[in-house]
Amino acid sequence: MAKKIQAYIKLQVKAGQANPSPPVGPALGQHGVNIMEFCKAFNARTQGQEPGLPTPVIITVYSDRSFTFETKSTPASVLLKKAAGLTSGSARPNTVKVGTVTRAQLEDIAKAKQADLTAADLDAAVRTIAGSARSMGLNVEGV
């Protein structure tokens, strides 16, 4: 018989830096999950990623207090800000442009995100990432 699902918890945790402090501790603690077990497993799974990049994670908590989790790729906005060398996007993206990204940078980001995107091919994924860049106030070259 399959385990009964008690809750889904969605968090963004920095790769390789999960610890019991907020937001991880309180979110897992209220469902009775072993926090240190999650932190060790998460840090082990994200070991190959660049440390400090936020990594979305979906934790499935079962009624017997066990859990499984699935990590996603880093959000496109974080990767775009890193590619453009920015700390934040534009407050008024339609009028104030704060940086520029090239098609090559967009392709690199699209390849990293392709598993989490609904795009049929790489070109569609690049267009999706380019739209995100424009909505952040970045100029897009070559698309």
Swiss-Prot record:
Keywords, ordered alphabetically: Methylation, Ribonucleoprotein, Ribosomal protein, RNA-binding, rRNA-binding
Modifications made to the protein after synthesis: One or more lysine residues are methylated.
Q: Which CDD domains does the record cross-reference, listed alphabetically? A: Ribosomal_L11
Give a short account of what the protein does: Forms part of the ribosomal stalk which helps the ribosome interact with GTP-bound translation factors.
Q: Which family does it belong to?
A: Belongs to the universal ribosomal protein uL11 family.
NCBIfam families per record: L11_bact (TIGR01632)
Record protein name field? Large ribosomal subunit protein uL11
**What's the source species for this entry?**
Pseudomonas entomophila (strain L48)
